[in-house]
């Protein structure tokens, strides 16, 4: 895996985990934080709607 691809994956994972943490307080947090990066918004929404994936990321 290239360094850039790994960095992007790590950033995506971090954003997803952070979004899961604040999900109950700020449901639109990831959407507002991402701005023009629609890819992150899509992944974040899908992860938020999937309790199993969210639990797996927390472990």
From Swiss-Prot:
Superkingdom, natural source: Eukaryota
GO MF term (any one): toxin activity
Major subcellular site: secreted
Tissues of expression: Expressed by the venom duct.
Additional comment: The mature peptide does not contain cysteine residue.
Similarity annotation: Belongs to the FARP (FMRFamide related peptide) family.
Free-text function comment from the UniProt entry: This peptide activates human and mouse sensory neuron-specific G-protein coupled receptors MRGPRX1. The activity on human receptors has been measured (EC(50)=1.8 uM). Compared with the agonist chloroquine (anti-malaria drug), it is 200-fold more potent. The peptide also causes an increase in cytosolic calcium in a specific subset of DRG neurons, and, in contrast to other Conus venom peptides, the peptide also affects a large fraction of the non-neuronal cells.
Protein name per the record: Conorfamide-Vc1
Protein source organism: Conus victoriae (Queen Victoria cone)
């Amino acid at each position: 895996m290239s360094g850039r691809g790994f960095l992007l994956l790590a950033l995506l994972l971090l954003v997803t985990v952070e979004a899961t943490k604040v999900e109950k307080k700020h449901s639109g947090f990831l959407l507002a934080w991402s701005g023009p990066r629609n890819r992150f918004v899509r992944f974040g929404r899908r992860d938020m709607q999937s309790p199993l994936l969210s639990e797996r990321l927390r472990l």
